[in-house]
């Protein structure tokens, strides 16, 4: 069975995987500290594979990413690159974007424990994650224009939604390095912590709170609703009502109410695997929900 697979014993490329532990928390560590955790194509490919496996694994309830050593990730390893350029504009696919979409499409909550400087895809890969916690000493840069290219990893979608269009344009246009607590990054991080060594412990604390106290299916559907970006309150009302209809009939709803009234920790049982064929939400021509995932 998939949930018996040992992530930690598999030979990943410059990645260390811990867990999932008894609470369902898995940690993916970028383990290339001698190169400031710069990403290579094999690392990226392995992360996409890991996310796909953990998405389908009921024993995984939350995924935390962090970096080995003082850096989180210095971006793509420019000495190796991210593979060949597509033969045409229409066939080329950004490798960083494939990772971003794998994170976005993973139905488990993801947390970035940004323990140090994050540059380029090192920061854009975190934008689709549910939560970002950064060390106060971390430095952040979106340096694409300084390399003669443009934003990657679907960051032109995520960054403006996180920090606002004005700040996003400033960050993209300058490509400069900013401290994690810069006003330009306001909205990007849920928390900034000090010292840097406390970044992962704090992320694990948040992950444990989610894994122990929140319904997996409820967490996913709520995030799905947020990303639908309804154009009006009425549209949001219809989407929420459709999702609530399915959840009112779930074991998790019954347990959530019962545990609250009994003043105890909930024991949620619904899993993504069991719910994979329900909960479809429609919006115009777009059908979204547990069963819908765009191909990478």
Curated annotation (Swiss-Prot):
Further facts: Gene clusters encoding host-selective toxins (HSTs) are localized on conditionally dispensable chromosomes (CDCs), also called supernumerary chromosomes, where they are present in multiple copies. The CDCs are not essential for saprophytic growth but controls host-selective pathogenicity.
Metabolic or biological pathway, per its Swiss-Prot or TrEMBL entry: Mycotoxin biosynthesis
Name of this protein: Enoyl-CoA hydratase AKT3-1
Traits of the deletion mutant: Abolishes the production of AF-toxins and their precuror 9,10-epoxy-8-hydroxy-9-methyl-decatrienoic acid; and impairs the pathogenicity.
Species name: Alternaria alternata
Disulfide bonds, paired cysteine numbers: none
Gene: AKT3-1
Subcellular location: Peroxisome
Similarity field: Belongs to the enoyl-CoA hydratase/isomerase family.
Main location: other
GO molecular function: enoyl-CoA hydratase activity
Enzyme class: lyase
Keyword Lyase (UniProt): yes
EC number: 4.2.1.17
Reaction catalyzed: a (3S)-3-hydroxyacyl-CoA = a (2E)-enoyl-CoA + H2O; a 4-saturated-(3S)-3-hydroxyacyl-CoA = a (3E)-enoyl-CoA + H2O
């Amino acid at each position: 069975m998939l949930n018996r697979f040992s992530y930690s014993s598999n030979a990943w490329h410059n990645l260390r995987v811990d867990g999932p532990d008894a609470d369902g928390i898995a940690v993916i560590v970028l383990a290339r500290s001698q190169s400031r955790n710069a990403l290579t194509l094999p690392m990226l490919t392995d992360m996409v594979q890991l996310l796909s496996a953990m998405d389908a694994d009921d024993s995984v309830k939350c995924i935390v990413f962090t970096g080995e050593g003082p850096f989180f990730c210095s971006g793509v390893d420019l000495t190796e690159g991210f593979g060949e350029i597509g033969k045409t504009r229409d066939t080329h696919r950004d490798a960083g974007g494939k990772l971003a979409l794998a994170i976005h499409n993973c139905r488990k909550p993801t947390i970035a424990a940004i323990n140090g400087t994050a540059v380029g895809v090192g920061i854009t890969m975190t934008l689709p994650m549910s939560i970002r916690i950064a060390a106060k000493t971390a430095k952040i840069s979106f340096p694409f224009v300084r390399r003669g290219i443009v934003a990657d990893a679907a960051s032109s979608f995520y960054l403006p939604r996180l920090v606002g269009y004005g700040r996003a344009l400033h960050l993209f246009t300058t490509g400069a390095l900013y401290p994690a607590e810069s006003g330009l990054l306001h909205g990007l991080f849920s928390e900034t912590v000090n010292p840097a060594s406390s970044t992962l412990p704090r992320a694990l604390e948040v992950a444990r709170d989610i894994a122990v106290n929140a319904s997996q299916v409820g967490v996913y559907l709520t995030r799905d609703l947020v990303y639908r970006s309804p154009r009006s309150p009425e549209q949001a009302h219809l989407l929420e009502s459709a999702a609530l209809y399915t959840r009112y009939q779930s074991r998790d709803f019954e347990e959530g109410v019962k545990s609250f009234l009994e003043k105890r920790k909930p024991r949620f049982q619904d899993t993504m695997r069991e719910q994979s064929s329900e909960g479809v939400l429609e919006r115009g021509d777009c059908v979204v929900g547990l069963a819908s995932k765009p191909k990478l």
